[in-house]
Amino acid sequence: MNKHFLLLFSLFYFIVEATSLKCVTCHLRTQSDHCRRGFGVCLAQKHEICMSLRIYFSGSLQLSYMVCQRFCKNLTYIFNNRTYTHKCCNSDFCNFRL
């Protein structure tokens, strides 16, 4: 009985793992397209999706930030002559392409 339970549990774990949303993480990506901090992949938890924040100055990308995020809203606003663009998506690695 315990062997069957362990086998079922293992299969369930791999199915859940295979279906988890994967997002790129980068806590500081520069305009030269290099991630300076926190590069990797996060597995979105319950109610999380992929998020990208990009900061522009005079129309030129200055830096970006990418993570798995629970509360995410597509939003663009201007503050101190910089444009902040939040984008949310829900397919694997989609925040890298935004």
Swiss-Prot record:
<dbReference type="GO" id="GO:0005576">
    <property type="term" value="C:extracellular region"/>
</dbReference>
<feature type="disulfide bond">
    <location>
        <begin position="72"/>
        <end position="88"/>
    </location>
</feature>
<feature type="domain" description="UPAR/Ly6">
    <location>
        <begin position="21"/>
        <end position="97"/>
    </location>
</feature>
<feature type="signal peptide">
    <location>
        <begin position="1"/>
        <end position="20"/>
    </location>
</feature>
<comment type="similarity">
    <text>Belongs to the PATE family.</text>
</comment>
<dbReference type="InterPro" id="IPR045860">
    <property type="entry name" value="Snake_toxin-like_sf"/>
</dbReference>
<keyword id="KW-0964">Secreted</keyword>
<dbReference type="Pfam" id="PF00021">
    <property type="entry name" value="UPAR_LY6"/>
</dbReference>
<feature type="disulfide bond">
    <location>
        <begin position="23"/>
        <end position="50"/>
    </location>
</feature>
<dbReference type="InterPro" id="IPR051110">
    <property type="entry name" value="Ly-6/neurotoxin-like_GPI-ap"/>
</dbReference>
<feature type="disulfide bond">
    <location>
        <begin position="26"/>
        <end position="35"/>
    </location>
</feature>
<keyword id="KW-1015">Disulfide bond</keyword>
<keyword id="KW-0732">Signal</keyword>
<feature type="disulfide bond">
    <location>
        <begin position="42"/>
        <end position="68"/>
    </location>
</feature>
<dbReference type="InterPro" id="IPR016054">
    <property type="entry name" value="LY6_UPA_recep-like"/>
</dbReference>
<protein>
    <recommendedName>
        <fullName>Prostate and testis expressed protein 3</fullName>
    </recommendedName>
</protein>
